Amino acid sequence: MQPGAALNRRLWLCLGLLQGLANGYSMTPPTLNITEDSYVIDTGDSLSISCRGQHPLEWTWRGAQEVLTTGGKDSEDTQVVQDCEGTEARPYCKVLSLAQTHANNTGSYYCYYKYIKARIEGTTAASTYVFVRDFEQPFINKPDTLLVNRKDSMWVPCLVSIPGLNITLRSQSSVLHPDGQEVLWDDRRGMRVPTLLLRDALYLQCETTWGDQDFLSNPFLVHITGNELYDIQLYPKKSLELLVGEKLVLNCTVWAEFDSGVTFDWDYPGKQAERAKWVPERRSQQTHTELSSILTIHNVSQHDLGPYVCEANNGIQQFRESTEVIVHEKPFISVEWLKGPVLEATAGDEMVKLPVKLAAYPPPEFQWYKDRKAVTGRHNPHALVLKEVTEASAGVYTLALWNSAAGLRQNISLELVVNVPPHIHEKEASSPSIYSRHSRQTLTCTTYGVPQPLSVQWHWRPWTPCKTFAQRSLRRRQPRDGMPQCRDWKEVTTQDAVNPIESLDTWTESVEGKNKTVSKLVIQDANVSAMYKCVVFNKVGQDERLIYFYVTTIPDGFSIESEPSEDPLEGQSVRLSCRADNYTYEHLRWYRLNLSTLHDAQGNPLLLDCKNVHLFATPLEANLEEAEPGARHATLSLNIPRVAPEDEGDYVCEVQDRRSQDKHCHKKYLSVQALEAPRLTQNLTDLLVNVRTSLEMRCPVAGAHVPSIVWYKDERLLEKESGIDLADSNQRLSIQRVREEDAGRYLCSVCNAKGCVNSSASVAVEGSEDKGSMEIVILIGTGVIAVFFWVLLLLIFCNMKRPAHADIKTGYLSIIMDPGEVPLEEQCEYLSYDVSQWEFPRERLHLGRVLGHGAFGKVVEASAFGINKGSSCDTVAVKMLKEGATASEHRALMSELKILIHIGNHLNVVNLLGACTKPNGPLMVIVEFCKYGNLSNFLRVKRETFDPYAEKSPEQRRRFRAMVEGAKADRRRLGSTDRALFTRFLMGKGSARRAPFVQEAEDLWLSPLTMEDLVCYSFQVARGMEFLASRKCIHRDLAARNILLSESDIVKICDFGLARDIYKDPDYVRKGSARLPLKWMAPESIFDKVYTTQSDVWSFGVLLWEIFSLGASPYPGVQINEEFCQRLKDGTRMRAPELATPAIRHIMQSCWSGDPKARPAFSDLVEILGDLLQGGGWQEEEEECMALHSSQSSEEDGFMQASTTALHITEADAESSPPSMHCHSLAARYYNCVSFPGRLVRGTKAPGSSRMKTFEELPMTPTTYKASVDNQTDSGMVLASEEFEQIESRHRQEGSFSRKDPGQHMDISRGHPDLQGRRRRPTQGAQGGKVFYNNEYGEVSQPCTEGDCCPSAGSTFFADSNY
């Protein structure tokens, strides 16, 4: 251990123990092996005493100091202190050994704790008294002088080596014997004698007799004194500083008893040279005498610096005082920080000091400044004292020092940081404690503190009583609100929250120049009353806000309802109900305002307040209704049986707040409509009508409250029947196809409580009914013929537009089982459907807006109650058929359902949640809802915020690592084809059904898109396709439009099936009677209609191109025609996007291999992309790619060079080449090449294959085609049906599709949008995920209206109109 460290440890131990003693704490004392209070041995014997304790020990005894100072050889041999072995309870041990003891070794032997200054017997020390008997030397004291003063008694220290002797005290004139009262003897201390008996003594000796021999002690000379020194002072008291050549004057003064004598002596550096002179002075006062000695040196030098000591002695007492004299050669100023440049304080402190270490002579002038402004007041240059510290006290303080005479100036600055305990601002304003049931509520805590609180913690507890410490106001004697002292607070989470949590966000924003932390807890659906609190911390304090979240069905906890709700009519029964929540209000009362008292004598309106409503209103009798069981509100009803016009006026319901005792009131104005007698605005007139025509008669009525209008014909009541219609509250009579018997007298009678009014008219009918028989026959015949031709045309049109039934099943479903496993036409019958596992009740499914629709089906957003085996409401997507669907379309959707069941659950596949297949309604397939829509639209929207190397949060990186590590762990444990690849990442206990109200980590619309995100999306798609391949399923339409993006950057592969309108989607090109996504199809699929997992790998390469071009359409500017298909077959490929790294480019190239068997498997792609994502290799690749670009010409880009290099390394070259040639020694990480076993490194390099063909390098032959309406592509070019027929016929002539030679050229088409300005945040993402899409994929989705759907997490759009 270093000496400094040991010293520090000792000081720490000493201070700690002293502190413990000062505070009264007990301490275990050391113990001796000799337990007797006194111990007797004979001279010549050896003495050994061991001491043990809990702390380091030390010994002291009479004569020990002499041994240490003399260092004689004898003493070293006879007196030894050594360490010994301690015990577990007392680990420290010291043993004292004395050999050949003699009488002078008699005395007390103390063992004490070494680093504790206080030596307290029985606490910090232990001792024993040892007598070393020497019968020839019973007395062991030395000659000494005894000063006899005015004390009552004194000890004559006649020390003995033999205890129990009879001792007498002898002087020149008397002998004193111990009498046990005034004269006492102690074997350890000597003889105690009254001072009066010693006034005349000149000397004293102790005498004893042992055997026949008398012994006398050494004599004590007696000196009688009454001179007492009181105090001594040396001026100046502190150290004295001088310059060379200045005069030094020191004054040493002693205060002594009156008429005393004192001798002064000085000790100083120049004493031998007699540099100083001192002069004594004496001043007699009334009660004492002042004696001084003044030392003077007229011209000091460097030799005079040092300590100056003054000693005063009167023969009895001796006082010493010293000071330090410092001599400087020249003036100087030196200032340093004492505690560092930055000091901290807390707002509210009474005082803070800003100290500096200042050394200067002569004392300089000074000024303190704060932020370059002078600090007023009187201050000290050594420390600036600030009182009542506030946040405004923070700043930079500067001390300016200067000596104008010497031309010296120094400045030093200190920064004061004032820490402010956090404070929640919402506590200052009253907040509502009543919240409406099923409402969306936001609880906010805005806090400010220094340092800024790092987080805001939210807690909740059930609405149950808990102990409250409340104070009482002395004035009102009512309890104030106190913070409940509850111990059952729980952290707010999305899993076990009593009210579903939509989001919990915390951010920092600048308010009034201060950075404040804002935390918002959004409660999606207020269902249950609870207590919430937010807690904030920083290093100097904490604050919390308690929120009483009381949920009620009454708006604002207090409302008035009236029956009827509209203005009542005179004579109606009226009921006014005042409803108030029992938790908040009590003492309900009804009043009616007096109009005469609402104005003063001058007619001015008076201020109406709920506190004085009784002064302007009349109390009314009302009935308190009996509350229903479980009800938490009271209802006070005011009933008016027959309302009259004089009842019109203002009615006030008054309630009282239970806590504050404040009164609140609501006012309801009751407007009464006076009842009037009915009157006709128009009388009936006589009519003449033809037979088989229509007749209409009106009886318009004016006047309030018409209870009945009755029609009569020939004094017989006319009622509504076939051909006779009464409308508009019976004010209009209509007769269809008038007959002869309808002629007669018609009467309209209108009555209410005030009376009746009538009007009548005659109706005459002319013509005969026989004349219209032929007309009816002709009309009916014409109608039947028209309907027949219309149905015939409709059937012809449907047969032309619709594909065959088998085509519907196989053509509109993207994901199918491998035909090699199960034939397409047998897949629906082969797969089973378990009703008990997947059937979901229709009545618990609430359909919302349409997310997308196709020619035969549609996808609807819906709210499913309890689909996750709980009581929560989840937002789902429902696939269903349009109205009028055929049995074939029904079978196609059923096949899709069974395929989804067969596939099973996986994180990167849109999973099946349930289905409605029972015959009491339409067939509905319920799948997961992905709020961010398809990946293609998402990437296009995020182009503006693309930042390739933006830092990801630790949570995002944890998710990325979990994806890769989870995939590797599952593959190692169960194999890549096992169904257990469905990861547990963010999905709960292995279930695809999401837990309710999962809190989203962040809003993807607000975060920038990075290169790491693109690699992550690619990895997840590859993993999902690996799972589909393991389930013997083929997708056939793998593209970015069929990849959906969910929370936490999770992508899911979907199959829109019947819900995609391929007739309007420009990505589907007509081929014969079908429309196909040619840009994503492998050559064998285009020419041979062969769909395999290898053809899905080709589509995956095109998907990679889409991802790394940020949503661009493949083959930009290329005409999709016969020449395109032929060149694709011949090996021409797209150029890689600019954002693609070398590894990504190699993956694309390998996916586009002409030989399907040479393409990588999805398991290889998962491994490579996983390594890229986990290791961050894309960053290194980008740097190497930039270096590669700089060394190549613009004509031969990095993709071409890197691709050809990787393709054409032969096996021999690979064995002979150095390791650096293989992927830059990073083959295991796949940074600069793609290592597919047996895929890329094969065969020999074909001659002349140093470069590959791209579409833009070979000129396109301009050809004009006539575009039909249904042949649309995104490039504006079409490929007509007859062209495909030519391709197919030519292909049949050439033979079946075969792969090109490995050395064949491959072509990459360049296409990348302008990426300038990516850091601008898009405006469409500023509203929390609402996205507006172009018309390429459908119309803008609309949010669900209130009540139409269950609130979903984030309340965002589905983000894809084609779902």
UniProtKB/Swiss-Prot annotation:
Q: Which residues bind ATP?
A: 851-859, 879
> What cellular-component terms does GO give this entry?
cytoplasm; nucleus; plasma membrane; receptor complex
Which Gene3D superfamilies does its entry note? Answer: Immunoglobulins, Phosphorylase Kinase, domain 1, Transferase(Phosphotransferase) domain 1
Basic and acidic residues compositional bias, start-end: 1289-1317
**The EC number(s) this enzyme carries:** 2.7.10.1
The top EC class, named as a word, is transferase
- For this chain, the annotated S-S bridges are 51-111, 158-206, 252-310, 445-534, 466-486, 578-653, 699-751
State the protein's name. Vascular endothelial growth factor receptor 3
Q: Which organism is it from?
A: Rattus norvegicus (Rat)
